[in-house]
A protein has these predicted regions:
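Cell-envelope/extracellular polymer assembly enzymes that use nucleotide-activated donors
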Residues: 2-4, 35, 134
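Conserved donor-nucleotide/metal-binding helix-loop-beta segment in metal-dependent transferases, i.e.
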Residues: 78-100
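Short beta-strand-to-loop acidic/aromatic patch adjacent to the donor-nucleotide binding site
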Residues: 63-77
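Active-site-proximal specificity loops/subdomain of glycosyltransferases
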Residues: 31-64
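A conserved hydrophobic helix/loop-capping motif in glycosyltransferases and polysaccharide synthases
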Residues: 4-12
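Short, well-formed alpha-helical segments that are part of the catalytic scaffolds
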Residues: 12-28
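A recurrent flexible, glycine/aromatic-enriched loop bordering the glycosyltransferase active site
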Residues: 94-110, 117, 126-127
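C-terminal catalytic/acceptor-binding lobe
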Residues: 19, 127, 133-226
Length: 226
């Protein structure tokens, strides 16, 4: 089965090159039929991690593929961490390979059919944070199984398993904390499903500005989110 690794990206060229030159060869060896798509968002708007991942999924849009979200600054260090990526994931499950305790951020694996059912990430989380909590909200709404292997706050374990670079860029915070952490659960199931259907893969609008091949199994698309 094909596995698509999606890297949301902007202005982190050193981190990207490190990942492609050091981590990717190990992942290619462990995961048959692995392809990588780097989704680079243009400037002019705050970075939108959720929408860029949605675009990476939409580019292939196959219910039967595995997908892995991969932050560009996180690199598996030891064979056990590499093997986490190769774990099989059944339908209706999200596997948090490296994620927060109550969100689906960082490195997450799922089947295309599962991501499609939850309508992916919302598209209106501009700036840093909270889109990963929204994805977990959607997973819970659809009674998806959620498994976490290593969480952000397990400091000793994450240092053992991953090499993580510091982000020295100024982070512009997303102002939708209440939507993700408080308001979602206040709504009825009927209102939740309306909100999910009206914001995600089905409402995604973007334009591909440029496509390029970085390596034989690595493609980069530069996109404008509309």
């Amino acid at each position: 089965m094909k596995t698509i690794l999606i890297i949301p990206y902007r202005d982190r060229v050193n981190h990207l090159m490190y990942f492609l030159n050091n981590s990717l060869p190990k992942l290619v060896e462990a995961i048959p039929n692995l392809e990588v798509i780097v989704v680079e968002q243009t400037h002019g708007k705050r970075f939108n991690r959720g929408a860029t991942i949605n675009i990476g999924y939409d580019y292939y849009k196959n219910d039967d593929y595995y997908y892995i979200t991969q932050d560009v600054d996180v690199n598996p260090q030891i064979p056990e961490a590499i093997n986490f990526y190769a774990n099989e994931v059944k339908d209706n499950k999200f596997l948090g390979i490296y994620s927060d305790g109550d969100t689906l951020g960082g490195i997450v694996k799922f089947l295309g059919s599962t991501f499609s059912k939850t309508n992916g990430f919302p598209n209106d989380y501009w700036g840093w944070g909270h889109e990963d909590k929204e994805l977990e909200n959607r997973a819970r709404h659809f009674n998806c199984e959620i498994e976490k292997l290593i969480t952000f706050h397990e400091f000793d374990r994450k240092k053992k398993y991953f090499k993580i670079f510091e982000d020295n860029h100024i982070r512009e915070e997303c102002g939708k904390w209440h939507d993700a952490y408080a308001n979602f659960d206040r709504h009825s199931k009927d209102v939740q499903i309306i909100n999910i259907k009206n914001n995600g893969l089905t409402t995604l609008k973007y334009k591909i500005i440029k496509e390029s091949i970085l390596k034989p199994n690595v493609k980069k698309i530069k996109v404008e989110i509309l």
